[in-house]
Regions:
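Residues flanking N-terminal targeting/processing segments that define the start of mature chains
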Residues: 431-439, 448-449, 455, 473
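N-terminal leader/targeting segments
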Residues: 303, 445-446
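Hydrophobic alpha-helical signal/anchor motif
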Residues: 429-430, 442-443, 456-464, 471
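Intrinsically disordered, low-complexity segments
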Residues: 1-2, 449
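Compositionally biased, low-complexity intrinsically disordered regions
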Residues: 424-425, 437-438, 451-459, 466
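Alpha-helical transmembrane segments and their immediate juxtamembrane cytosolic regions
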Residues: 2-428
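A composition/secondary-structure signal for short, hydrophobic, low-basic-content segments
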Residues: 26, 299, 427-428, 448, ...
Length: 476
């Protein structure tokens, strides 16, 4: 399957800003919302957004719909520029898995070390869970990437009907889920996010970008209005994130409500798109976008371990307890808490951020499609196991109860996705283990190009160096 090739690369500032807004919102929410206390060897955890009336904040702070929207746009654009779907898939799968390897290596060692220093078992389990829980995104995004070439063809043929059908499937799943078949709800981990990902295709083609401000405001009103009606008269909770003790969550598993939320959020951002594009051209914002560009995936993966470090020292070591959310003391502590977490994250990025921009071999070709597909599915399975079980082995557990089997799956997936070593001879490429094929140039990319996808895009190496994003290649 050969992807169509496009004209020269140009930046889409809107997608850059959407990605930046998303990662800042994710990190800010995860750092600010925990309510922590420690007593009698037990770490108590709560959520500030569980405060009555604060659910409305989650309608804007739950930005995973924006991550999948931006990923859809970036994936379609980069797929069309790739020489073949094989080239595109091989690079994407390998690039998504590579930054996870150091996280797994570190967190296989951290729980035993904490126990060795005398940290009680329950806080160790909480730390291992928190460090791994966000891997759910990659467990869903990998299959999304694998399906992108097929979804791109479906988009070419049927256009808007594709996200409509996916949304309809999500609604049917919700009906079954709320009719005492709860496990079927996990099918929406694909239907919901694929529907939102597909909306990004329509932005990439220019349809959504051509909307005027009035039309975009109408889209936002329709999305948020539908969300409000479904919350008021349907089975859905008002909060767009999971709350401790809540019987139903809109996120685990995702509900069809997130599609209407995505429509509202995308419409809102499209309404201010000209202002966002102007903002991106200012020196400060431009510098921030360039700094964030090659670090999106690393920030996503390591911001929760940074929180674990700060909480371990402050809460377990110094006896700090989160003030009551909404009070002046709570507000006063936020800058100090965020600054401490940011300092730790900065150090972690210096240590492990290099894996996100590590170049792929320029003397080898991408793995065959079947290998990339198997690698993606294996990797998604391993990441899902880690997200569900965490990095800590239960007390008295066996090897089968530990994270080791899931880590092994992810490592095997990465090795399977590695590029096929090749020997260049007289314009022919001999691939070890595959058929002989003519060498093909990578159109629009210099030799040794390191561009990748993670939520998550890549900057043109000719513009700002090898910039890497967790939600696809934003180049247009």
């Amino acid at each position: 399957m050969r992807s169509s090739q496009k004209s020269p690369v140009r930046r889409d500032s809107f997608l850059d800003v959407v990605r930046a807004v998303a990662i800042v919102a994710v990190v800010g929410q995860h750092w600010i919302m925990p309510v922590l206390g420690y007593q009698d060897a037990h770490l108590a955890t709560g959520n500030a957004l569980a405060t009555p009336g604060w659910w409305v904040v989650t309608w804007l702070s739950q930005v995973m719909p924006l991550v999948f929207f931006a990923g859809g746009a970036a994936n379609l654009l980069s797929l069309r520029r790739a020489p073949t779907a094989r080239d595109w898939l091989g690079g994407r799968v390998q690039r998504l898995l590579l930054p996870v390897l150091p996280l797994m290596a570190v967190w296989l060692a951290v729980p035993p070390l904490l126990r060795g220093f005398g940290v009680p078992e329950q806080p160790v389990e909480v730390a291992g869970t928190i460090a791994a829980q966000l891997l759910w995104f990659l467990a869903v995004y990998l299959p999304t990437v694998l399906l992108t070439p097929l979804l791109a063809e479906a988009h070419r043929r049927w256009g808007l009907a594709v996200p409509v059908v996916l949304t309809g499937a999500a609604v049917l799943v919700d009906i079954a889920r709320f009719s005492d078949i709860p496990l079927v709800g996990y099918a929406n981990a694909l239907f919901v996010w694929l529907a939102v990902h597909q909306l990004g295709f329509h932005y990439a083609e220019g349809r959504l970008g051509r909307l005027g401000r009035g039309a975009a405001v109408g889209v936002a009103a329709a999305g948020f209005g539908s969300t409000a009606l479904l919350v008021a008269f349907g089975p859905y909770p008002a909060s767009m994130i999971g709350m401790p003790g809540a019987p139903v969550s809109n996120m685990s598993p995702p509900t069809a409500l997130l599609v209407s939320l995505a429509v509202g959020q995308v419409g809102l951002l499209l309404a201010v798109r000209p202002a966002l594009n102007r903002l991106a051209t200012t020196p400060v914002a431009g510098a921030a976008l360039r700094w964030l560009g090659p670090r999106f995936m690393s920030i996503y993966l390591w911001h929760m371990p940074a929180l674990v470090c700060v909480a371990g020292v402050a809460v377990l070591g110094l006896g700090y307890a989160t003030p009551e959310p909404g009070t002046l003391r709570w507000l006063a502590m936020i800058p100090l808490w965020v600054a401490a977490a940011a300092a730790v994250l900065g150090r972690l990025l210096r240590l492990f951020g290099r894996f996100e921009s590590m170049p792929l071999s320029s003397s080898a070709r991408p793995a065959p499609v079947w290998r990339s597909a198997c690698a993606g599915l294996l990797g998604a399975t391993g990441l899902l196991g880690l997200a569900a079980g965490g990095f800590s082995t239960p007390e008295g557990g066996t090897l089968a109860d530990s994270p080791v089997p899931w880590v092994a799956l992810v490592l095997a997936a990465f090795l399977l996705a590695r590029r096929v070593e090749a020997e260049q001879t007289g314009g022919r490429v001999v691939q070890h283990g595959t058929e002989e094929r003519p060498a093909e140039p990578v159109v629009g990319r210099p030799a040794g190009d390191r561009s990748q996808l993670p939520g998550v895009g890549v900057r043109d190496v000719r513009e700002v160096g090898a910039q890497h994003h967790p939600v696809g290649d934003p180049r247009q």
